[in-house]
Amino acid sequence: MKHQEYILQKAVCRFLEKEYPNVLFLSDTIGNIKLTESQAYRNKQIQKNGFKCPDLLILEPNRLWNGLFIELKIKSPYKKNGQLYKNEHLQAQEKSINDLIKKGYFAFFKWDFEDIKKLIHAYMKDK
C-alpha cells in the first residue's frame, strides 16, 4: 500500500518540477520509510503532537490561499455517501487538513493523479 502511495507522490513531485520549476515544495518522506525504534522516538520528539502533516506542501501563495497542502492517498478516504471512513489515522489527518484550512492554506485529500494535476494547475492560475 505504502509503495503505491510513494509512486503517486513521486509522480506528483516530477510533475511539479516540470510544470512549475520555480515553485518551492516539500514532500514528506517519513511515511514511506521504516525507522528504527530510536529514529522513530527521535522523530516523534520533534513533531507537533496530534498534527498529521500532509504528504505534499506546495509553498506558493495565490490570491486566496497561503499555500497548497495535499494528503495523498491511493484510493478515496471517503465512503460513497461522502463521509470519511471510520479510521483513527484518517480522522487525525482530516482534523489537520481542517486546521490548515482555518489558517489560510488550501488543503485536501487527493488520490487520482489526473485530478491532482488539474487542481494544481487551477491553484497556480489563481494568482
Region annotations inferred by a language model:
Residues 1-127:
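Catalytic phosphate/metal-binding cores of nucleic-acid and nucleotide-processing enzymes, i.e., regions
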